[in-house]
Regions:
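Cysteine-centric segments in proteins
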Residues: 1-103
């Protein structure tokens, strides 16, 4: 179990014949000497709405504290997301959840 605080984040939703899943697509800037990083959470189980942030709890036990002013994608995660769109199984959909709620 790990706790993450990403530099940028979005919620992605997948719909397949097996059901609907929402996950955090998170990224961190590497800075001058580091590499940018990204991570896709295991699947949101519940959300805490705290002042200025959401804390997303996931199937793996990990949490992502996502600051409201940091919602969005880096170029790195934008490219990753669009590469997934190209290889979706037939009948499956993948989308970015623009305004998050726990529906």
């Amino acid at each position: 179990m790990s706790d993450y605080v990403p530099d940028k984040w979005v919620i992605v939703e997948t719909v397949t014949s097996e059901g609907t899943t929402r996950k955090v697509l998170a990224s961190w800037y590497g800075g001058y000497q580091g590499a940018d990083e990204w991570r896709l959470s295991s699947g949101i189980t519940y959300t805490e709405d705290v002042e200025g942030a959401y804390i997303f709890h996931n199937e793996s036990g990990s949490t992502y504290e996502c600051i409201l002013g940091r919602q969005g994608m880096s170029i790195y995660t934008y490219d990753r997301y669009h590469s997934w769109l190209k290889v979706l199984p037939e009948g499956a959909t993948l989308r970015i959840v623009e305004e998050y709620n726990e529906d």
